[in-house]
Amino acid sequence: MPAAIHRPARTLYCGEVRPAHIGQTVTLYGWIDRRRDHGGVIFLDLRDRSGIVQLVADPQKTPQSYPLAGEVRNEYVVRVTGTVQQRPPDSFNPRLATGEVEIYAEQLEVLSPVGKQLPFSVSGEEAEEVREEIRLRYRYLDLRRERMSRNLQLRHRVIQAIRRFLEDEEGFVEVETPILTRSTPEGARDYLVPSRVNPGEWFALPQSPQLFKQLLMVAGVDRYYQIARCFRDEDLRADRQPEFTQLDMEMSFMDQEGILELNERLICHIFKTVKGIHLPRPFPRLTYAEAMARYGSDKPDTRFGMELVDVSEVFQGSRFKVFAKVLAEGGLIKILPVPGGDEKISNTRIKPGGDLFKLVTQYGAGGLAFIRVRPDSLDTIGALKESLSPEQEKRLLDLTQAKPGDLLLFGAGPAAVVNESLGRLRLHLGQELGLIPENALNLLWITDFPMFEFNAEENRLEALHHPFTAPHPDDLADLKTARAQAYDLVWNGVEVGGGSLRIYQREIQEQVFQAIGLTPEQARDKFGFLLEAFEYGTPPHGGIAYGLDRLVMLLAGEDSIRDVIAFPKTQQARCLLTGAPSSVEAKQLKELHVASTYQPG
């Protein structure tokens, strides 16, 4: 065996070197970020996760390291031992925390050279221009970049802040729940795992720890939390992954007010600890009905105005046939006021074929009527213009608070269609017209969701959140139209967390299962263990779960959760680094009693 190599221990990380260390001999380890040769003196930028420090190799002052310094290249892994010196004042670098010092490299050792051409530059602005597929293929290089390293460290600090708050200040207990569990009928598609020991039977990977955390409340754990891995086999978007992480919490003997208050303090603690931002409390609240009526969304971005205005009353008995028909059929008419929109938005974009027309029709709207507010008149299409009386024109201006130069865009039809189409249009135009202040932080709670929504394809009700959400006590007489004791936390138009009080009485849980179309036999087969647990003394309880990836993404100012996950999947649910998913050997399938029916091409 070769003799063991003894190297000096690291005394500092690269980004920690400061003027206080001047005159000290230090040993650092890291990667060569950049090499520069200035008049025979070689400067090396040494990088690790903490930052960058400048090394100096001088043929007179550091003759031992100088020859090797001329040979190293970007991304070589090296050890350096040297003396910390102050930089000449005219060479201070204010962009670096270490910018007032440099290290004269008295010893330099290459621990690992780069044997191949780098697929992309890890440092500098060039690194930001690399296609994402290449970055994901060489993720271990991508994660060396300052931005990505910063994101991973931010994620760590968020989790650290969560643990310290929940454990040290609130008495929560961290409990791991099973990854191999059983498939349930609600929610997205499950990832299934065949059981070799029990042929013909399957595990499912958990979409959330929902049932287990409720059982922990039955068990008397009282306050539970977990940084939980979850899995959903669904179509992917920029903010979705097949496997993701959530902060999962459950609490016994707390009402909704107590849960929201505790969670506001948690979020404020995270912002203060991680970003140094003090958030005002309490957070604003809107009911689901208010949010849909005013913003056309159950996760409204309240950083800007442009609230929807219901003008149905103005068109009662209207001679404009389109609106009259909508009202006769029980629909409504709303306006999206666009400040300054008269000049900024052309008729071409609003009429059939235009991009705004296409946007609203994508969500079920029949089209976009409009009014342009001019100094002395309202300008619109002929039929609508002819139907408006002076009193109606005045009432429209009063309701919308419109001023000359504004544009009024109409939505007419069923409430759900009008709200969603105008809500989407509101966000689109708010971004396009620069009405959304980028640095604003608006957090609010949405409460009183409906218990159920109708699934037209399956001709049945389904739980809007999940079937374990407790109905509002005032609505128990008619569960199908009941409000849920559910709440979502929305940050700048993005849902970052959601939870509810839970059902803890067997008879109510059975009624909810029946409402979503489960027979008593199906309910017992799928959830008999939960129903039985409710017979043994169950505390009132509730909880919440946060999408940790999404929360960190917003804190980091990123646009995709892939940029805050170490090894993410693509939007095709593939890992470009490892090649997963992949085919497996026939022997493995045989052991699992599984056969593939897939025929390529």
Curated annotation (Swiss-Prot):
Localization terms from the record: Cytoplasm
GO molecular function annotation: aspartate-tRNA ligase activity; aspartate-tRNA(Asn) ligase activity; ATP binding; nucleic acid binding
GO cellular component: cytoplasm
Alphabetical GO biological process terms: aspartyl-tRNA aminoacylation
Cited PANTHER family: ASPARTATE--TRNA LIGASE, MITOCHONDRIAL, ASPARTYL/LYSYL-TRNA SYNTHETASE
Sequence positions that bind L-aspartate: E186, R232, H465, R502
Keywords: Aminoacyl-tRNA synthetase, ATP-binding, Cytoplasm, Ligase, Nucleotide-binding, Protein biosynthesis
Name under which the protein is recorded: Aspartate--tRNA(Asp/Asn) ligase
Biological function: Aspartyl-tRNA synthetase with relaxed tRNA specificity since it is able to aspartylate not only its cognate tRNA(Asp) but also tRNA(Asn). Reaction proceeds in two steps: L-aspartate is first activated by ATP to form Asp-AMP and then transferred to the acceptor end of tRNA(Asp/Asn).
Subunit structure comment from the entry: Homodimer.
E.C. code: 6.1.1.23
InterPro entries found in the cross-reference section: Aa-tRNA-synt_II (IPR004364), aa-tRNA-synth_II (IPR006195), aa-tRNA-synth_II/BPL/LPL (IPR045864), Asp-tRNA-ligase_1 (IPR004524), Asp-tRNA-ligase_1_N (IPR047089), Asp/Asn-tRNA-synth_IIb (IPR002312), AspRS_core (IPR047090), GAD-like_sf (IPR004115)
Highest taxon above the source species: Bacteria
Reaction catalysis annotation: tRNA(Asx) + L-aspartate + ATP = L-aspartyl-tRNA(Asx) + AMP + diphosphate
Keyword Transcription found: no
Region called Aspartate, residue ranges: 210-213
Major localisation: cytoplasm
Family from the record: Belongs to the class-II aminoacyl-tRNA synthetase family. Type 1 subfamily.
Chain sites annotated for binding ATP: R232, D233, E234, Q241, E495, G547, L548, D549, R550
NCBIfam families listed in its UniProt record: aspS_bact, PRK00476.1
Marked site: Important for tRNA non-discrimination: H38
